[in-house]
Amino acid sequence: MTVQGVKFSGVGAATPRQCLTNAHLSALVDTSDEWIQSRTGIQERHVAAPDQRLVDLASEAAGAALQMAGLDPTAVDLIILATSTPDDLFGTACLVQTRIGAVNAVAFDLTAACSGFLFALVTAAQYLRTGAYRSALVVGGDILSRWVDWGDRRTCILFGDGAGAMVLQASDVDQLLSFELRSDGRLNEHLTLAFAGTPQTLGENLAIAQGGFAPITMNGREVYRFAVTQVPEVIEKALHRAGCTVEEIDWLVLHQANQRILDAVAERLGIPQEKVISNVGQCGNTSAASIPLALSKPIQQGHIQPGDLIATAGFGAGLTWGAALFRWQ
């Protein structure tokens, strides 16, 4: 089997029309715009309407990415949807496949929380590198507003909804220079969206648990400590594998958890703020969508140029984290 390279040829994004401001949240819980901004950098976030589904946002982002890449949907071989909030627990990727007309694509969901897009991107790249497929559509999307406790000011201020997508294609030159993925289930309790079942008796000495998922719970202090120590390490590991230095990085694109984490990671790596891409102020933490959402606008506006070296890192529940180093197009 011939090993081939990977190039990144299109990106797209989608957010709901509804905008939830800090002022809105101040009417729901004991908080304020100043309190939220000083701790997170978030000013507003978008939330899906009751009739809006993940497939809607994911398909919109996918369509924009395909258009940028100049790739017909029928030419897509693989679709990976990174999400923790599917419309259907059996999977939403196939719904996206049908919606966009990618009739020839294999489609499946991947769950790695806020690390999901990065894990999906690396997974898709391996399919292309082996020659099994020629093109892949990687989508990250979440509607976390479904699973937030809107009475818990520690979490309800953080999350927004959205989707982002990227097109990967086989290439003679490999633009994915390196990656480093990590997981540690011992830290799982710090960030969960767990099943909460109620026992139901089916017969004598026979019972099951039925129920749904409890709202998101998070130990913010531990997640912050984890992110600012582990994320710089995996970025440095990816740089070492690629034979690159921190100084060669043109753009740092992290999972948009909150501005304090972005600033702390950049400072630890010695990366100046002008190289750090952030949209957390306008979008909040959009989980698996955050990296492609953050990339979309600067690419469309021409700030990110072909050949630019991008260091990206995701981190989240699991706990999972990782980094990838790639050149745009």
Curated annotation (Swiss-Prot):
NCBIfam families: fabH, PRK09352.1. Its main location: cytoplasm. This is Beta-ketoacyl-[acyl-carrier-protein] synthase III. It comes from Thermosynechococcus vestitus (strain NIES-2133 / IAM M-273 / BP-1). The lineage of its organism: Bacteria, Bacillati, Cyanobacteriota, Cyanophyceae, Acaryochloridales. GO terms for cellular component: cytoplasm. The gene is fabH. Belongs to the thiolase-like superfamily. FabH family. It catalyses: malonyl-[ACP] + acetyl-CoA + H(+) = 3-oxobutanoyl-[ACP] + CO2 + CoA. Homodimer. Its EC number is 2.3.1.180. GO terms for molecular function: 3-oxoacyl-[acyl-carrier-protein] synthase activity; beta-ketoacyl-acyl-carrier-protein synthase III activity. Pathway: Lipid metabolism; fatty acid biosynthesis. The active site is at 114, 255, 285. The last Arg residue of the ACP-binding site is essential for the weak association between ACP/AcpP and FabH. HAMAP family: FabH. Residues 256-260 are annotated as: ACP-binding. It is found in: Cytoplasm. Keywords: Acyltransferase, Cytoplasm, Fatty acid biosynthesis, Fatty acid metabolism, Lipid biosynthesis, Lipid metabolism, Multifunctional enzyme, Transferase.
